[in-house]
Every structure is written in structure tokens, then in C-alpha cells.
Amino acid sequence: NETLKLIKKLNPENVILHDVFDGFSINHHELNDPFIQFKKENDGTNSLKDEIEVMLNGLEAFKDYNVSIVRSNHDDFLDRWLKNTDWRKANTMKNSIEYMEYSWLLLKNAAPNGIIPFLIRGKYPKMKTLNRNDSLIINGWEVAQHGDIGSNGSRGSLLQFRKLNTKIIVGHYHSPERKDGALSVGTSTKLRVNYNQGPSSWLHSHVIIHTDGKAQHINFLNGHFTTFK
């Protein structure tokens, strides 16, 4: 994994992660597509239990770092699924136990910041799980916002964020971009998924914040970073 190689090379004081949960198994955008649901049922990718396990196992590689996980829109997929789904009428029954367990957590207010942060903190108590209204500033850069939500609940964009009175780095757009003091990282996913049809600006890319406050994109081309060669 080239991202982990980069982290080991830099040994940063902080590691900021976005969208650690995809929500593919219960994606609300696909719940009414019978053909996608048929495929998921056949290949087993509609198992929420398995997807949660993959997420938690993936975070194992970061446990020795000072990790902060930004609340992201894909995290919301799970809470939205719990609110809007009647488990008795769901496309599959395999997620019924998770539905019951996670709903109980919400009912007794055990997971006020959402199910994904609750599960992460349960296994990795040293990792910080940031809420939507939290702030985390590193060397002058705000890094606690995902970028999907802007001022006063509006839709976020770099054009809007560049007007803030602080510099900011977000992670929602999957494409590296810079507009004055507003930066967006790229993605660590596959560059082609179901929903990014047509010409794409997606790129594997991270942002590093230097000790002097300068922020720099590190792009991965053909699966490798070349900045330090």
C-alpha cells in the first residue's frame, strides 16, 4: 500500500482520514436498483457485518499513529439506513442483527456522534473521531471538515471555503485541487466506481502539512508517488 509507505517515510505527527467507511453494502442510492441488488446478493457485498469488519481491520495499519477520523458523508449512509429502513422489508435479511444492535445503540443514546465513530472508538480508543462541528487546526490549517457541508448547512465547495477566515483542507471531492487557502485531497479508492461516469478528475492524492505551515499535494501516478525520488 503506497499510502502506508508514504506515512512510514514521513512519520507525521498527525494522520487525518476521511470516508473510512464506504457504505457500499447499504448504499441508499442503489437500494431500488434490482439488478445491483441481485449482484450484491450473489457476491455477498450486501453484508454490512463484513463491510464493518473490513473497515476496522483496515484501520489496524494506522493504530500506531496519532489518527483523527473526520466525520464524512459515507459515515452518514449507515445512520440514514437505520432511520429509513424497515428491516422486515429490507432487500436482504442478512443485516437484520446489525440493524437491531445499531438501532439499540441510537435508542439509548450510546452513539450520539453516529454508529461508525462508536464502532471505531470501541476497537481503537486512541483514535479521535471528529464530529461535524468540531475543529482541528494543524499548523494553521483546519482539517476537521470533510467538505460535503459548507457554511450553515449549505453544500460545501472550495469556492465557498476559500472565503473562510482560515485555511482549510477537505476530502470530499476525490480530486486534488487548490483554490487559494482551500485545498482538497484526492482519493484512495479505485479511480472508477459505479457513479463517476464520463471524464474524471479523480486522482490518488494526499496533502502533507509541513512544519512551516506550507501544504503540499502528493500525487500518485500509476500507483506510486514520485515526489521524493
Located regions from the model:
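Flexible, charged surface loops at secondary-structure boundaries
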Residues: 7-11, 61-64, 119-123, 136-139, ...
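A generic local structural motif
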Residues: 2-3, 56-57, 129-136, 153-158
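Active-site-proximal loop/helix segment associated with metal-binding centers of metalloenzymes
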Residues: 85-142
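Polar, enzyme-active/binding microenvironments
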Residues: 9, 222-229
